[in-house]
């Protein structure tokens, strides 16, 4: 078996990062499902900041809407932060994993760069568990700070009806019910024409 050298480990880490980037890029190219042939019912979508702890609020609204409007389909998901923050958080995640793997495998990235190994890196090598825990928690803190948007966005049939980012507050159930009633009042069901030739 070939001995693992620093160069081989670096190539392995590079391949893992490239694979992660390819998987990430493939996930964005999904084609949305069309609504043709489906029973079209009103659909309410909640996009919320998962790292802010708004999932519980989403579940409460789902329960309220299920009682009052059982015909409405309710979907929910994470609100991805706009702009550069999302990509920076992904880069911090990859960097965190690379550093932890380097510490655990006792590979010094400074030797690849032709630099002397700093004393703090040697200290990390001597205290691997402590160093890995600190890297993990600091990385998570930075990621959470970058992706926490404070969003709680509500759309009904792809029409925005409430934005916590704009109003600064959650809608009360009464306000949400009034918005839904007003929206459903204007949407009329398509009546089949008996004279239409099929």
Curated annotation (Swiss-Prot):
Q: Which residues form the signal peptide?
A: 1-25
**Superkingdom per UniProt:** Eukaryota
> Which reaction does this chain catalyze?
[thioredoxin]-dithiol + NADP(+) = [thioredoxin]-disulfide + NADPH + H(+)
Give a GO molecular function annotation for the protein: thioredoxin-disulfide reductase (NADPH) activity
**Glycosyltransferase in keyword set:** no
Functional description taken from the UniProt entry: Probably has thioredoxin reductase-like oxidoreductase activity.
Q: What is this protein called?
A: Thioredoxin reductase-like selenoprotein T homolog CG3887
């Amino acid at each position: 078996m070939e001995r693992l050298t620093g160069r081989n480990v670096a190539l392995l880490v590079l391949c893992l990062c490239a694979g992660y980037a390819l998987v990430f890029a493939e996930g964005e190219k999904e084609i949305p499902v069309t609504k043709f042939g489906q029973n079209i019912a009103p659909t309410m979508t909640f996009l919320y900041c998962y790292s802010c702890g708004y999932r519980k609020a989403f579940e409460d609204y789902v329960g309220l809407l299920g009682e009052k409007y059982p015909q409405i389909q309710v979907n929910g998901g994470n609100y991805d932060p706009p702009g550069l923050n999302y990509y920076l958080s992904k880069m911090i995640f990859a960097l965190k994993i690379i550093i932890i793997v380097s510490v655990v495998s006792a590979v010094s990235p400074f030797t690849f760069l032709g630099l002397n190994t700093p004393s703090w890196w040697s200290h990390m090598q001597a205290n691997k568990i402590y160093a890995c825990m600190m890297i993990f928690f600091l990385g998570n803190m930075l990621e959470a700070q970058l992706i926490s948007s404070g969003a709680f966005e509500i759309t009904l049939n792809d029409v925005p009806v409430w934005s916590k980012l704009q109003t600064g507050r959650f809608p009360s159930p009464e306000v949400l019910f009034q918005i839904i009633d007003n929206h459903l009042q204007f949407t009329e069901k398509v009546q089949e024409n008996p004279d239409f030739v099929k």
